[in-house]
Amino acid sequence: VGTKKPNPWGLYDMHGNVAEWTLDQYIPTAYNQRETKVKNPYEIPTKTYPRTVRGGAWTDAAQRLRSAARRPSSSKWKKRDPQIPKSKWWHTDAPFVGFRIVRPVEVPSPEEQKKYWSYESN
């Protein structure tokens, strides 16, 4: 981790073998709805699917192998999940998707945590 140079935004290790499954709700027109500069473009989820999957994977064509590439997630990616209830995190039928473990510098308040994770109860 962090053995290569950072990208122009100071982020390390942004590209790998799989696309990144994020918590953001997927909105196809999200970039068109934005102001010119956005500090935190997080789209608060209102449902479990679709989520935004960013970047490319080993299965993708060259034009998708960039951080800006976006696609929606699908509940079909859990079709063969043997768990009952199905896992929130395991995409049995999407070996091209992974996730990045991150944490905030400051621990969010209980209210912020509830807001952030409340989509799971929908």
Where in this protein do the model-derived segments appear?
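Surface-exposed recognition segments
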Residues: 3, 14-122
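Short loop/turn microsegments at loop-to-beta-strand junctions
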Residues: 6-9
